[in-house]
């Protein structure tokens, strides 16, 4: 994996929930739909996930009349701590590798994100703008899983609510402010 700074996007993000719930948002088709493509107004459809080394994933990303087909192969699957997979926009020369490391941190999870293999500087810039938005949407989806905002069907057990109460209150306030705008 070529992770030199000119060809790599590195991000860290704190989620208000344990690694197993962050893992679920990242890997379950019913939850991927909540965040994937959101930074550019897209909505994910036809999500397929074969979550094992050598398994594949794919989806159709739609924004009005624009459709993108995105797919890849899982290289490392160490639930709920490490996920490495390829990321390809069909019909383009865009092939990259993403690694997501989920580390327990206090009552939450610290994500260490690395994406490499950008075909040009512009692609890296676009992803550097898009991923932070997607991670915020993922964080909001995680809070919704805890009962803030809309509820998801077939959720993991809510055994991890202890310790996130202060984060939930902050999220409630933020969601109320955003709804008022």
Regions found by a protein language model. Name each.
Residues 13, 61, 87, 164, ...:
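Pocket-edge structural micro-motifs
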Residues 10-11, 30-67, 150-160:
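Short beta-edge strand/loop motif at the mouth of beta-sheet-based domains
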Residues 33, 47-106, 116:
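Hydrophobic-ligand binding "helix-grip"
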Residues 1-41, 168, 172-181:
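Hydrophobic ligand-binding cavity/cleft-lining segments
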Residues 2-4, 66, 104-181:
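Terminal "cap-and-tail" regions of soluble proteins that handle hydrophobic small molecules
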Residues 10, 21, 58, 82-84, ...:
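General beta-strand recognition
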Residues 27, 96, 109:
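Ser/Thr-centric signal marking residues that sit
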Residues 19-34, 73-80, 126-140:
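K/E-rich alpha-helical interaction surfaces of small helical-bundle regulatory domains
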């Amino acid at each position: 994996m070529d992770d030199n700074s000119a060809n790599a996007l590195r991000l860290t993000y704190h989620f208000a929930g344990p690694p197993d719930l962050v893992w679920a948002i990242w890997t379950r088709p019913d939850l991927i739909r909540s965040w994937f493509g959101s930074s550019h107004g897209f909505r994910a459809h036809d999500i397929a996930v074969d979550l094992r080394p050598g398994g594949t994933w794919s989806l159709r990303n739609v924004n009005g009349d624009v459709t993108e087909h995105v797919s890849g192969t899982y290289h490392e699957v160490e639930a709920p701590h490490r996920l490495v997979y390829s990321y390809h926009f069909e019909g383009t020369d865009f092939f990259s590798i993403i690694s997501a490391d989920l580390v327990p941190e206090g009552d939450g999870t610290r994500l260490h994100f690395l994406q490499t293999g950008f075909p040009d500087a512009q692609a890296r810039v676009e992803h550097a703008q898009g991923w932070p938005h997607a991670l915020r949407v993922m964080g909001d989806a995680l809070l919704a899983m805890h009962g803030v905002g809309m509820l998801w069907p077939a959720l993991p057990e809510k055994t991890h609510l202890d310790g996130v109460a202060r984060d939930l209150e902050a999220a409630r306030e933020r969601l109320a402010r955003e709804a008022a705008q």
